[in-house]
Each structure stands twice: as C-alpha cells, then as structure tokens.
Amino acid sequence: MKMEPDEVSSLRKHRFVGTDNSILGRYVLHHYTNWMLEKIPAFVAPNMLTLCGLIAMVASLALTLAFDPCLCSPPAFLSLANFLLMFVYFTCDNLDGAQARKTGSGSSLGQLFDHGVDSCCALITSIALSSTFGFGLSPKFLIFTLAVMVQFYLAGIEEKFTGRFVLGRISGASEGVVFAMGAHLATFLCGKRLFRHLFSDNFLWPVKKIYSSILGTDNFSAVSVIIGTALVFNTASTLISIEFKMHFPRRLLLYSTILRVMSFVTSFVILHNTLSTESLWIRHLNILMFGQIFSIKYVNEVCSYIIRRDPFLFTPPYLMYLTVSAVLQLQYLKEFRETLVAISFLLSSMYYLLVALRIIITFKEALGISFLSITTSDKSKAGG
C-alpha cells in the first residue's frame, strides 16, 4: 500500500471526532472507564489494550465453535466463558481510547486498528449470541448475523460521509454489548431453555399473529421478522440521516458503496443456503470468510476517510467471493464445493493478514510512531 504525499499529509492531520450519546455510556460506563483507567499504567499502549480485547473475542469464537459447533446447545461453562471474555473485550474497547487521551498517544493508526478489531468482533458476537439463543445455523442465525453486521457497517459509513462517529441514545457499542453479556450470563444462570422459550412462536404469538395477517402465511419465525423489521427500519433511518448531511454528488458515492455491500451480503446468503447440506466445518469456513471480507471492506471505508482516497483493499477477496458464490450454484460442481470453499478461505485469510500487516506498517512509518508501545516521539507527534 503506497501513499502519496497528500495522503500522508491527510493521515497526519486527521483527528477522530466521536460523540457517545448512549445512556449507559454517559451515566455508567464513563465512571467505570475512569475507575479502570486509574489502574492502567501509563506505559501500556492503547493498541495493546485493543489487541487484548481481540484475543479475548478470538478465544470466545474458538470455544463456541469447538463446544457448540451447531450453535444450538451451549454447555453452561461456554455461556459463562463467553460472558467473561466479552467483558474483557468490552472493558478493553472502552479503555483504549481513554488510555490514548490519558497518555497523549492517540493516532489515526489507533483509530483504524480499533475499528478493524471491532469489525471482527461484530461477527464473533453474533456467532456467540446465536449459540446462547439456540438459533443454530438456521435462517434465524442468518438474519441475526446480517442485522448485527449491517448496523455496524452503517456506523462506519456515517463516519466516512459525515466526518463524525456518533453513537445514539441506544447504541450497539454500549447497550448492545451489555445486552449480549447479560444474555450469556442469564443462560449460564437459568439454562439454555430460557431464550428458546422467550424467542419461541408460542411466547411471541401476538407478533406471529400480526405478521401472519400481513404476509398471508405463517411459514416464518416470529423472532426472525422482529429482527428483520428492526434491520430495515434502522437501515432506512440511518441512510436518511446521512443523506440530510450530504450534497447530491456524495449521495451517488454513498449508494454505490451500499450497492457493493448488498451484493456481497446477497452472495453470502446464497452461499450459506447452498452449503446447508455440507459439513459443519465448511459452513463455518464460509461464515468466517464472510467476516474477513466484511472486515476488510469496513477497514477500507475507514482508511479512505482518513487518507481521503479509496484504496479498494477489499476488491480481490470481494470479487473472489462473488465468483465462488455464483460458480457453486452449478450442479456439476457440487462435489467440489468443500474444496473450493476451503481454498477460498485460505486465500482470503492470507490476503486479510497481509493487508492488515501492510496497513499497520504503512501507517506506522508514515506517522513515525510505534504500534504496541508508547515512546516520547509518539506523544509529541500525536499532539502535533
């Protein structure tokens, strides 16, 4: 990744502008973060805290896929482990920015790394929660995962096109994560039948009845239409909010960006359904590959906002995924599905790691700072 002089200048001048309007953030988490911040030594780099949060969530993913691969029957210890690991991630995610301000070592590299880690953790959160809710690898899992991922992506899009990262009164980063932790803990304490009952059609019968009369069929789950309705409403309201803050030429760029994302999401849905009769591990690889490419796409949006140029980092794996999704619909290639998905996942993983490493090195060298440690020069350059 080569940067032109004007892009380096944009990188050095960039300052993160964020507003947390969430209720929990303002009245609870702010005090918790300040209390925890007093326990963190000044030599601990913000990116190290971010990395610790990522490690905790990767551990959560590994445990979930190992002990509940079907995402429908989590053992009690798994729910407790996911609660504790998410609590570690949540704490680190709140502390990294505060530590950067405390030590004067904030940078655009830190912002990009934090957003990149959060984009990975969005998928991991949806997988762990699907296990806790007992969704399985069903349409409920699919729509829930897409709801989490799309809403997360829209927050990044809003930052790119408006110049501000704004968390609403009820935000996924605060209330959403606390709800997820509460769900894991409740399942550990009350058992896995809790959410199976709460999300059943019998419990949600009023919703089932209303939507059955609207759709003319009852061949759906009530919780799926609730999630789907929330997804459509939040997506529409977010796009309208962004539009009001933009000029017309920028709107065309906005919708071309959204179109690429929707084509990718559509390919994921198609391939997920195509692989429904294949081995569990292949279905897992497809989900993880979707998460990798989604993360690259999200990081690309943040990166383009920071350096004022779209580097199109996502293009190779994006085109590969669309091609694989289309090719595997051919019946005579059915016996090669597992091989093609496995190879695609391997290539996507290699590309993902190389892109992440290249971005970190490029930004680090352009800014003249360290990545996982704090030096005197880091503070002076962050301040300048």
UniProtKB/Swiss-Prot annotation:
<keyword id="KW-0594">Phospholipid biosynthesis</keyword>
<dbReference type="Pfam" id="PF01066">
    <property type="entry name" value="CDP-OH_P_transf"/>
</dbReference>
<dbReference type="InterPro" id="IPR048254">
    <property type="entry name" value="CDP_ALCOHOL_P_TRANSF_CS"/>
</dbReference>
<dbReference type="GO" id="GO:0016020">
    <property type="term" value="C:membrane"/>
</dbReference>
<keyword id="KW-0808">Transferase</keyword>
<keyword id="KW-0444">Lipid biosynthesis</keyword>
<dbReference type="InterPro" id="IPR043130">
    <property type="entry name" value="CDP-OH_PTrfase_TM_dom"/>
</dbReference>
<keyword id="KW-0472">Membrane</keyword>
<comment type="similarity">
    <text>Belongs to the CDP-alcohol phosphatidyltransferase class-I family.</text>
</comment>
<keyword id="KW-0443">Lipid metabolism</keyword>
<dbReference type="InterPro" id="IPR014472">
    <property type="entry name" value="CHOPT"/>
</dbReference>
<dbReference type="GO" id="GO:0006646">
    <property type="term" value="P:phosphatidylethanolamine biosynthetic process"/>
</dbReference>
<protein>
    <recommendedName>
        <fullName>CDP-diacylglycerol--serine O-phosphatidyltransferase</fullName>
        <ecNumber>2.7.8.8</ecNumber>
    </recommendedName>
</protein>
<keyword id="KW-1208">Phospholipid metabolism</keyword>
<comment type="pathway">
    <text>Phospholipid metabolism; phosphatidylethanolamine biosynthesis; phosphatidylethanolamine from CDP-diacylglycerol: step 1/2.</text>
</comment>
<dbReference type="InterPro" id="IPR000462">
    <property type="entry name" value="CDP-OH_P_trans"/>
</dbReference>
<dbReference type="GO" id="GO:0003882">
    <property type="term" value="F:CDP-diacylglycerol-serine O-phosphatidyltransferase activity"/>
</dbReference>
